[in-house]
């Protein structure tokens, strides 16, 4: 590359903004990758904490259930103790002996001791319940494995305490059983002392009682005899039913055999008809074989004719393919001839275009030299004008470098054009063939025009980038002036203390602050290039804040779920009351898809409907003699269970009004 005296030498410049931008982008990508990694690790830790929290809550619920059961047992023992104490007082009043009084006093003392022990156990259970609730709340806020281990140890300690208290409760139950036995003995002694001498009235009552027992015994024998008769009748009915089932089975087998016989008869008729048709075809064939040829000979000749036809079809296909190939070759030759003619015309026109292009390039060269002079003169004028200001040396050097590069490329292009023209002249002198000379000149003109187009496109690109840079600089300066001239005014707006929008803005502001601090520390750690595998404290604080937000959200969800459960229970009770008041049945939904219906007129009677097996169970048949008839009519025949229930309600209402 040739250089003039005015062109400046190459100067080392700092890294370009594009390189720094790429470096910053790589750093940002690295930080984003590390941020995503931290997010995934935090999510995994949160899921582990949720699983541990669910396990602790399950253990807490189990512990609370055991505590409730122990408390219920304690209350039951307390009630039994009170009842035994009352019975002991009654036995003390009834028994006149000193031994009975001493036993009653001892029993009363043991009852008081058991009551005191029961109260102590109840207080211990309440304390354990409070400690278990505190442990459950502490377990819900635990964030590490050590806290979970401590809570599990505490739960094991509570379980051991509960087992110990259950053992004590069982011992108290045994003692209560012993006291009940003693009270029963005292009652028996009191009864013996009160009934040692029987009067005449008692003897008469005993006789009446004996006669009543004899009558009941006779009645039971009659009922037993009637039961035996019914059993024999039932056995005879079962034998008849079995014989009827056997006859029905034999009848179905005979019917199946009869149907098979009909099918075989139909098949025999079809075969006979087919035989007749085949005999007719055979007679027709005998008419056509007058020359004595058999069907095998005819089939052989037909197969030979098919093979010959296939061979002829294959030959015709090959000939058709050869003909198509000849047509394609003829078309290709005609196309090549037309292309050669067009190429000849293009070669002739390219000579004229080269002459015009050479003249235009000379003109552009002169114009580019003049443009370079004008640009350098403008740069000098700008440098004289900007002497009082602080110039941007980097932009000036860049513009000056662009001008020098443009000038050098123009000179290189001119020299290359001269060399190409000299080579063209030498080839034209050495080679007398006009076709080869025309081809070489076409190649040189094509290369020259391609290089010129590339330089023009590059020049336009540089001009466009320069204009964009100037426009961006002017916009940034305008924004800077507006920001400097902006006077902020503080506006106070009256808001609620627990405003959801303000709370959301506070959460977002805190998250933004934590993320900025985390980004700054990560950038500092990345710039320092520390080899330690550690994360800054801001990352941990930000993750802790996210966990706190999730816990708040979980608390609100649990609160909402509890409210919905309460509402569901209340609405269920309202539904049951509405059904009871409208239909007259109190519904009780049991496990296994069963529904227990209690009528309002007979609360000691019920109907149990099993919706899975479609069965109905009731004890109303004892008060309704027409129960079986109604069941067969409305349920078995009409399949109308609502009508059956309405009929039951009408009958119960009539019976209650008549009573």
UniProtKB/Swiss-Prot annotation:
Subcellular location as annotated: Nucleus
Keywords, sorted A to Z: Cell cycle, Cell division, Coiled coil, Mitosis, Nucleus
Coiled-coil spans in chain: 23-531
Region (Disordered): 1-24
Biased composition range(s): Polar residues: 1-10
One GO term (biological process): attachment of mitotic spindle microtubules to kinetochore
GO CC annotation, single: mitotic spindle
Pfam families membership: MAD (PF05557)
InterPro entries listed in its UniProt record: Mad1
Family note: Belongs to the MAD1 family.
Functional summary from the UniProt entry: Central component of the spindle assembly checkpoint.
UniProt protein name: Spindle assembly checkpoint component MAD1
Gene that encodes the chain: MAD1
């Amino acid at each position: 590359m040739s250089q003039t005296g005015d062109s400046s030498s190459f100067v080392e410049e700092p890294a370009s903004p594009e390189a720094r931008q790429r470096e910053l982008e790589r750093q940002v990508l690295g930080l984003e990758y590390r941020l995503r990694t931290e997010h995934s690790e935090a999510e995994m830790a949160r899921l582990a904490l949720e699983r541990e929290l669910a396990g602790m809550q399950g253990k807490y619920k189990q512990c609370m259930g055991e505590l409730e059961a122990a408390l219920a047992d304690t209350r039951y023992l307390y009630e039994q103790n009170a009842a035994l104490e009352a019975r002991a007082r009654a036995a003390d009043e009834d028994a006149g002996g000193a031994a009975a009084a001493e036993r009653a006093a001892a029993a009363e003392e043991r009852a008081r001791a058991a009551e005191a022990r029961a109260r102590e156990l109840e207080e211990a259970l309440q304390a354990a319940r409070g400690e278990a609730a505190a442990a459950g709340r502490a377990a819900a806020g635990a964030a590490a494995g050590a806290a979970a281990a401590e809570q599990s140890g505490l739960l094991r300690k509570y379980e051991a305490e509960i087992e110990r208290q259950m053992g004590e409760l069982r011992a108290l139950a045994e003692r209560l059983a012993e006291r009940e036995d003693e009270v029963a003995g005292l009652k028996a002694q009191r009864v013996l002392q009160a009934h040692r001498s029987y009067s005449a009235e008692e003897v008469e009552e005993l006789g009446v009682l004996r006669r009543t027992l004899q009558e009941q015994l006779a009645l039971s024998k009659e009922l037993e005899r009637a039961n035996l008769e019914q059993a024999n009748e039932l056995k005879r009915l079962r034998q008849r039913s079995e014989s009827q089932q056997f006859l029905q089975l034999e009848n179905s087998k005979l019917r199946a055999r009869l149907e098979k016989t009909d099918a075989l008869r139909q098949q025999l008729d079809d075969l006979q008809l087919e035989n007749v048709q085949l005999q007719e075809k055979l007679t027709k064939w005998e008419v056509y074989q007058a020359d004595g040829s058999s069907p095998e000979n005819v089939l052989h000749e037909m197969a030979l004719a098919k093979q010959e036809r296939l061979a002829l079809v294959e030959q015709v296909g090959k000939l058709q393919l050869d003909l198509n190939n000849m047509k394609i070759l003829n078309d290709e030759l005609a196309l090549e001839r037309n292309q050669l003619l067009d190429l000849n015309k293009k070669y002739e026109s390219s000579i004229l275009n080269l002459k015009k292009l050479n003249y235009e390039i000379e003109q552009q060269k002169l114009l580019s030299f003049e443009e370079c002079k004008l640009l350098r003169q403008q740069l000098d004028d700008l440098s004289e004008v900007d002497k009082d200001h602080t110039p941007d040396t980097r932009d000036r050097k860049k513009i000056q470098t662009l001008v020098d590069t443009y000038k050098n490329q123009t000179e290189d292009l001119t020299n290359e054009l001269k060399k190409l023209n000299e080579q063209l002249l030498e080839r034209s002198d050495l080679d007398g063939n006009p076709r080869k000379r025309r081809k070489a000149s076409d190649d040189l003109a094509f290369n020259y025009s391609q290089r010129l187009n590339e330089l023009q496109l590059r020049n336009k690109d540089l001009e466009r980038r320069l204009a964009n840079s100037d426009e961006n600089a002017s916009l940034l300066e305008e924004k800077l002036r507006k920001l400097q001239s902006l006077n902020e005014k503080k506006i106070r707006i009256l808001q609620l203390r627990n405003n959801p929008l303000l709370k959301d803005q506070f959460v977002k502001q805190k998250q933004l602050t934590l993320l900025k601090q985390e980004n700054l520390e990560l950038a500092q750690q990345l710039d320092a290039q520390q080899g330690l595998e550690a994360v800054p404290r801001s990352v941990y604080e930000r993750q802790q804040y996210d966990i706190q937000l999730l816990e708040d959200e979980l608390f609100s969800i649990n609160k909402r779920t509890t409210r919905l459960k309460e509402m569901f229970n209340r609405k269920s009770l309202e539904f049951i009351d509405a059904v009871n008041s409208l239909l007259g049945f109190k519904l009780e939904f049991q496990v296994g898809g069963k529904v227990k219906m209690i009528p309002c007129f007979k609360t000691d009677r019920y109907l149990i409907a099993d919706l899975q097996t479609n069965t109905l169970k009731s004890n109303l048949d004892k008060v309704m003699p027409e129960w079986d008839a109604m069941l067969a009519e409305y349920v078995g025949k009409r399949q109308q269970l609502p009508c059956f229930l309405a009929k039951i309600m009408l009958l119960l209402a009539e019976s209650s009004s008549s009573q």
